[in-house]
Amino acid sequence: MGEAFQLLKARHSWTSTEPGIAMTISTSSSARFATRHSAQEDVFALVIATVLVSFGVVLLRQAGVMTGGTAGIALLIHYSFALPFGAVFFALNLPFYYLSLRRMGWLFTLKTFCAVALVSFFSDQHAVFIHIDQLQPFYAAVLGNLILGVGFLILFRHKASLGGVNILALYLQDRYGFKAGWLQMGIDIGVLLASLTFISLPILACSILGAVLLNFIIAQNHRADRYSA
C-alpha cells in the first residue's frame, strides 16, 4: 500500500508544521481548481469506501491471505492471537493520528479517523450477514485486492486514507530524510515474512500478487494528469 499513499501525497499540497522543516508538496493545476466535495458527499463516500475496504479484508482474512501496511499487521495479530481484526486495526492506528495531524492537518486526520473506525466496525459486521464456507486463496487475493483498490481510490479522491504506517513513513521522510517508499516497502516485506510462521509459500505468493495488484490499480487510476477530482 506504500506506492498508493505516495500517489496520494504527490497529488495534493501539504505543508509540514514540524519545527525546522519547510516542506511543501506541489499540487497539479487541474487539482487546484477542481470543485471541492461537499460534506454530504464526503460522508457518503467514506461509508461506501469503508464498506468496500472492510469486505475486501474479510475475503483476505477468510482465505488466510496477507496484505501489507497496518492492515497486514492487524491480520498478523488476528491470525496469531485470534483477536478481533476490527479492534486490533483500530488500536494500531491510534498512535499515528498525532503524526497525521502535524503532517496533513485536522480535516484529513478527522476523515482518516472516521475511515479507520468504520473499517474496524464493518469488518466484524460482515460475518453477521455473510458466511463463506470455502474460498480459494488466489481468487480471494485477486478479488479482495480489487475491492480494496476501489475503496482506496474513493478515500483518496475525498482526501482521506486508512492512516497507519503510511503516515509514519512520510513523517520519517520529512524528519530524517528517509525515503518513504522504501520504508513502506520494508515494513510490508517484514509483515509478509513474519506471516511465514503460519501461512504456506503458495499463500505467500498469492499475498504478494494481491499487493502488487492493489498498487497497480491505484497507480493507474489515481493520477493528477488524468483526473482532477
Locations of regions flagged by a protein language model:
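Core subunits and conserved enzymes of cellular information-processing
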Residues: 5-229
